[in-house]
Amino acid sequence: HGVSGHGQHGVHG
């Protein structure tokens, strides 16, 4: 789910 704080995908997808 990406990086904490991004919720959906963030940086890591």
Curated annotation (Swiss-Prot):
Cellular component annotations (GO), alphabetically ordered: extracellular region
Keywords noted in UniProt: Antiviral protein, Immunity, Innate immunity, Secreted
Signal peptide start-end: none
Gene induction: By bacterial infection.
GO biological process, one term: innate immune response
Location(s) in or outside the cell: Secreted
Tissue expr: Hemolymph.
Main localization, broad class: secreted
Subunit structure: Monomer.
Functional note: Antimicrobial peptide presumably with antiparasitic, antiviral and/or antitumoral activities.
Additional comment: Stimulates antiviral and antitumoral resistance when injected in mice. Enhances natural cytotoxicity of blood and spleen lymphocytes. Induces interferon production in mouse and human.
Name of protein: Alloferon-1
Species of the source: Calliphora vicina
